[in-house]
């Protein structure tokens, strides 16, 4: 049976971290042997991407959670019954995700893979080049397979508006564990976008700090643009909770109570409360047998290596 996928602090933090919006690294360097796959976008494609994505085409884009159905189906197994079958009357769902106002550095990404147009969520992150965006690996590479084309980032998207314009990618980066093997444990990617009007993305919308090799079980605030029912992908949504380990598929990813749906993939996880913290994961996947839980990959040294590579 084909299973559906749902994907989609002020205290000092130990471990690898980068300061919010400063571009100044205070993190330990990534391992030299970190496996990274990089794709340079043809200049002509970058130049044409911003005019290619009309409002109508954006609206018709498909949530990219469908690209990881096979990986999750292999892990998603229901437990065996251990008692008598019992049924209780249904209640109307209470959504965990809540609508919030647009955040300048969080937005949507639009791209093409296999001839189809897709949409995900993403976030501007601090970097030496000032133009780096974080998202899910499956939002820029088939895992395994080709890299996306016509990739653009639209920060602070809401109801079709793009107050800061469209930012086309010049380079796409992801761990080889994702690009060669589709390993869901490494479902993170980074896009380097072109400056607009002589200004970098970070100078225009800001950029979140990022953190790697932190403890597990932290409290997070998650953001994304879920597009599958009951959401429509037109507004930013937020969830918050404490992360727990994956008890179903046995991945190294962590789960947080959150009912965001497809389209939210790639949205940032911030340590602590609100969107001003450091980013430490992305929305990646959910299990059909465990509704209302969003999983995100553990950001360790491999993903740190991909991040460092995106900075050139």
Give residue spans per PLM region:
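Secretory targeting and sorting signals
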Residues: 1-29
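Protease-domain processing segments flanking chymotrypsin-fold serine proteases, especially trypsin-like
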Residues: 26-126
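Terminal peptide-recognition signature
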Residues: 54, 109, 122, 135, ...
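Conserved catalytic-core segment of clan PA serine endopeptidases
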Residues: 88, 92-117, 125-126, 146, ...
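Acidic glycine-/aspartate-rich tracts in secreted/extracellular proteins
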Residues: 139-140, 157-160, 195-198, 226-228, ...
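Chymotrypsin/trypsin-fold serine protease catalytic domain
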Residues: 169, 184-188, 192-257
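Catalytic nucleophile loop of clan PA
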Residues: 259-282
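C-terminal cap/linker of serine protease catalytic domains
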Residues: 280, 284-312
